[in-house]
A protein has these predicted regions:
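Transmembrane alpha-helical segments of integral membrane proteins
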Residues: 177, 196, 200-215
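Alpha-helical transmembrane segments of multi-pass membrane proteins, especially transporters
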Residues: 31-36, 60-68, 72, 159-171, ...
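Core segments of transmembrane alpha-helices
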Residues: 40-44, 167-177
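Internal alpha-helical transmembrane segments
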Residues: 2-83
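Residue-level signature of catalytic and energy-coupling elements of molecular machines
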Residues: 39, 78, 127-130, 171, ...
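C-terminal ends of transmembrane helices
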Residues: 81-85, 152-153, 206-216
């Protein structure tokens, strides 16, 4: 009896037994957004309080905060675009090589797949049937080979532009939080408001991080808050010292 192979059956060599569903450890848009907000928040809290510590005119703090937001967001977006583009091009190149290997050396690729499934506990006869059935569908065979040999799915390659846009927006949102008080106030009141907003946002980011990592929400949120407050205290202290020295 011939075996009809579907993508689910073809993946049997990698997941022969049902098991507990795990978190997506390779990422996703929501995960990237959370960490982008965290970067923007920490960066601009540090910058704004560092500048505010020198007690300049409120306009100087606003300008510094806006510059940090724009520069940081563009930097994050550019870095994400370059990184994602390079990864996508590399994957596409490797997929093209695998496609050519399947075309030129089908028997060799067939034996590789049989050997792989056998090494994972699939009976030799069943492994042979699966590999043979796969060879009848070139695209499915390519998908399985690239997933097994490269660890990627050709159909799940992300968009560099989308990744860059997400990084830009996430960083900008995080960086805007400690800057908001400086559009409506100045002096110590704005400093305190920036610290409070930064602290609340840090707790929210820490809670979101815990959702992705599976850690304790309280512990992760407190850790995120502690990091933000240490960074804020250090930069504010440096700004104050520089302001006193130059004043």
């Amino acid at each position: 009896m011939e075996l009809e192979v579907t993508p689910a059956i073809a993946a049997a060599g990698t997941a022969p037994v049902p098991h507990e569903r795990h978190r997506d450890v390779q990422g996703g848009a929501a995960r990237a957004a959370v960490f982008g907000v965290s970067d923007g928040l920490l960066t601009n809290v540090s910058l704004i309080l560092g500048v505010a510590g020198a007690h300049p005119a409120p306009g100087v703090v606003r300008l510094a905060g806006l510059a940090g937001l724009v520069a940081g967001a563009f930097s994050m977006a550019a870095g994400e675009y370059v990184s994602m583009s390079a990864q996508k091009e590399l994957i596409q190149r490797e997929v093209s090589i695998e496609r050519e290997e399947l075309r030129r050396h089908p028997e060799s690729e067939h034996r590789e797949l049989v050997t792989l499934y056998v090494s994972r506990g699939v009976p030799a006869e069943a492994a042979e049937q699966v590999a043979t059935a796969l060879s009848r569908d070139p695209e499915l065979a390519l998908e399985v080979h690239t997933r097994e040999e490269l660890g990627v799915n050709p159909g799940s390659i992300g968009s560099p532009r989308a990744a860059a846009s997400s990084s830009f927006g996430a960083f900008a949102v995080g960086a805007l939080v400690p800057l908001i008080p400086w559009f409506f106030g100045s002096g110590d009141a704005a400093v305190v408001a920036s610290i409070i907003l930064g602290a609340l946002a840090s707790l929210a980011v820490g809670t979101a991080v815990a959702v992705f990592t599976g850690r304790s929400r309280v512990r992760t949120a407190v850790r995120q808050l502690a990091i933000a407050m240490v960074v804020a205290a250090v930069t504010y202290g440096i700004g104050t010292a520089v302001g006193v020295h130059t004043g």
